[in-house]
Regions:
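Secondary-structure junction motif
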Residues: 2-3, 17-38, 102-110
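Thr-Gly-centered strand-to-loop micro-motif
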Residues: 4, 21-22, 44, 67-68
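Beta-alpha-beta core module
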Residues: 5-6, 52-99
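Alpha-helical segments flanking ligand/cofactor-binding loops in enzyme cores
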Residues: 11, 55-56, 107
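Short beta-strand-to-loop elements that line the ligand-binding cleft
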Residues: 41-53
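Extended ligand-binding regions for polar small-molecule ligands
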Residues: 91, 95-118
Length: 118
C-alpha cells in the first residue's frame, strides 16, 4: 500500500512489519532515535546486518525499512519513499595520513563527496 506514495508520514509504518538493522549497526541508533522522537513503536519483524539484505527482504514484500539513501537500493526491486517528518543528517568522517602527497584521484574523490581536506 505504501508503494503508491512518493512521500509518507513516519506514523504510516507503525503497524507494518518493520525490517531494521542490528543494534551494532552504525545506522541503527539513528533509526531508533527517529522512531523514539516521533513516539512510534513499530513491530520489528527482522534485524539484519547488511544494506543489501534489508533491501532484499523489503523487495520480497516481507516488511518496510528505514534506510540511508544509497545507490545499492536502486539495483533492487524496491521503491524509495521520502519520509516527510524526517529532517535528519548524518555526518561521516574520513581518515587519511596528513603529511603525504594526495593523488589526483584522491582529491577528485574529496571534491565529489564535498568535504574538506585538512
Amino acid at each position: 500500500p505504501l508503494a503508491k506514495n512518493d512521500e509518507i508520514d513516519l506514523k504510516q509504518i507503525e503497524d507494518l512489519p518493520f525490517i531494521t538493522f542490528t543494534k551494532n549497526s552504525g545506522i541503527r541508533p539513528m533509526i531508533d532515535h527517529l522512531l523514539e522522537k516521533a513516539k512510534i513503536h513499530p513491530h520489528i519483524s527482522m534485524e539484519l546486518e547488511e544494506d543489501e539484505v534489508v533491501g532484499g527482504f523489503v523487495g520480497h514484500d516481507l516488511g518496510v525499512a528505514i534506510v540511508p539513501d544509497m545507490a545499492v537500493y536502486d539495483l533492487l526491486p524496491i521503491k524509495k519513499i521520502k519520509i516527510k517528518d524526517i529532517d535528519e543528517k548524518q555526518t561521516f568522517y574520513m581518515a587519511y595520513l596528513k603529511n603525504t602527497q594526495k593523488s589526483k584521484a584522491f582529491l577528485e574523490f574529496i571534491e565529489h563527496v564535498n568535504c574538506d581536506v585538512l
